[in-house]
């Protein structure tokens, strides 16, 4: 087998597959793509049917199933930290919500030294490059990219429309496109689903395009043990295949690109000798480069479910009954339509809870059934719910490798809810959600409040609910942050500070978490840096306008 390549990419996920596809567009370029998981089996409904999104989180075939250390502000719970395993990475198991973040997230990044070319108008062309939206291209959306994006249709569940209307009746804006001119407000939510109703992972969109090329070599079930260095230059990787303890060395003529995600990328750097000296010493790892920010600055989104009974039989509750599922599956399999062809997150929104926030600090996902994200604790009656959570928590966590063993999970601590702002935002969010659900648009459907229940009212009671019931939104990020400060890990092109031939390109390099789901932005990051790796001129900046709230009230 060939053992030398131009580039070695570690992780065939949301970013790694983008890079594999783009780098091999250049004639003669060779790429080794290593993935610790297996293939994205197209016959497996668990990963291919949008409505089955909870199934991959319930096992370990497609999910690393990490757990945090006891979270000190969350009743010392060990909390889920699911990450994708297999071709497609987390795009193979995520909720398929196509949300890019707010324009001001990127303008905020661009205010940091060294990140001036990460403003919204700089990154928008790369969002467009990646996307094919089913209703066509415009100034904000692409029409010929590898990622299929589906828009909600008017004949979808009536509860989606009622919940959006309720948000507007409560005084918040209406927006027709959460990824367009104005994110703030309530409206339809796009999703990464193909026209045939299949999950649009990066394995389907990017790898299918790249697999026929002679320059791309993909190895699945390949766990990267460590990066190999000659001095400060990355020259290759040492990896294990399957359960074997016999390692294989592969060498990179140009660069090693780490795309293992916000948990595994810092863990791999630490095991390879790049990180904080005290940690590496404790692991008995030889120091290659002192970089204290590796694994620090870890951020995530936390959310709660506000659940209600539905007084009319219009929810998706019947779809949870086993006797209805064969027909749903058949319609999806043969026609690519019906309940199975949607992730059922087709409406949502973003609001500011207080005037002090310049752009939205709270996100909503509306769901026409009452159930946990991972498929557990389904309410045994017709119901609906709002997922609500804060977007830019001041809390910061960390990822630490526990040993040199590449198969041992790292120590993860998010420090969820460690600041007063965190608690205030969740109290506000729950109370505002109740106001929204109380609007006339939902009078025909609103039953009793199931969770947390109407008698949960005081600050102390709401805080107790959040401590015991809040869950991750599965958005870990920022643990190898871009920047030039002492705790930055990479520069604005993903190059690891103080090293040569080594980049990190995935959600870990976000300097600050964005306002929304992470998959679309992770793909954009990879598209943008791919041009840098290839030595190409960046795409021209967009001239599209975007909404800035300014002095506008949070409610009209």
UniProtKB/Swiss-Prot annotation:
Please give the pathway this protein is involved in: Amine and polyamine biosynthesis; betaine biosynthesis via choline pathway; betaine aldehyde from choline (cytochrome c reductase route): step 1/1
Pfam family membership, one: GMC_oxred_N
| Cofactor(s) needed by this chain | FAD
Which Gene Ontology BP annotations are present? glycine betaine biosynthetic process from choline
What is this enzyme's EC? 1.1.99.1, 1.2.1.8
Organism of origin is Xanthomonas axonopodis pv. citri (strain 306)
* Gene Ontology cellular component annotations, sorted alphabetically: membrane
Q: What is this protein called?
A: Oxygen-dependent choline dehydrogenase
Catalytic reaction equation(s): choline + A = betaine aldehyde + AH2; betaine aldehyde + NAD(+) + H2O = glycine betaine + NADH + 2 H(+)
Report the family membership: Belongs to the GMC oxidoreductase family.
HAMAP family according to UniProt:
Choline_dehydrogen
Top-level taxon in the UniProt lineage: Bacteria
**Residues annotated as transmembrane:** none
Q: What does this protein do?
A: Involved in the biosynthesis of the osmoprotectant glycine betaine. Catalyzes the oxidation of choline to betaine aldehyde and betaine aldehyde to glycine betaine at the same rate.
Q: Which GO terms describe its molecular function?
A: betaine-aldehyde dehydrogenase (NAD+) activity; choline dehydrogenase activity; flavin adenine dinucleotide binding
Q: Which residues bind FAD?
A: 6-35
User: Which residues constitute the catalytic centre?
Assistant: 475
UniProt keyword annotations, A-Z: FAD, Flavoprotein, NAD, Oxidoreductase
